[in-house]
């Protein structure tokens, strides 16, 4: 193989098409892989079946918002009665740590039938009041 002393582009200067032929002149883009066209035409059946959310604006995620994982007293009571959430006994008190379970807020919807001490990051005033009326208490222990 011959070693070029100069680049081929130097030799091709002034040749108009630079060696890419008379018709296309290297202007086509070839196969574009995943860039699909015809979603309103020939690929419509694929779009209907698999392309949920293909068109339209889809919003954005606000980077300053903090996600809150909340649980209501109603749901907590159901989980306690079904045995899904285990109650820990410490110094004669029944303790439920919602922070360990992935919840960081206790809401006041519904009621609770078991007097327990609940550890959670945040709680509404109504939730605290309902737990105290039942004979339990809410310990606010922020996580983060």
UniProtKB/Swiss-Prot annotation:
Residues 1-14 have a biased composition (Basic residues). Residues 1-35 are annotated as: Disordered. Pfam families: Ribosomal_L27A (PF00828). One of its GO terms (biological process) is translation. InterPro entries: Rbsml_uL15_N, Ribosomal_uL15, Ribosomal_uL15/eL18, Ribosomal_uL15/eL18_sf, Ribosomal_uL15_CS. The keyword rRNA-binding applies. GO terms for cellular component: cytosolic large ribosomal subunit. Keywords: Ribonucleoprotein, Ribosomal protein, RNA-binding, rRNA-binding. Disulfide bonds: none annotated. One of its GO terms (molecular function) is structural constituent of ribosome. Gene3D superfamilies: 3.100.10.10, 4.10.990.10. Part of the 50S ribosomal subunit. HAMAP family: Ribosomal_uL15 (MF_01341). Binds to the 23S rRNA. Belongs to the universal ribosomal protein uL15 family. This is Large ribosomal subunit protein uL15.
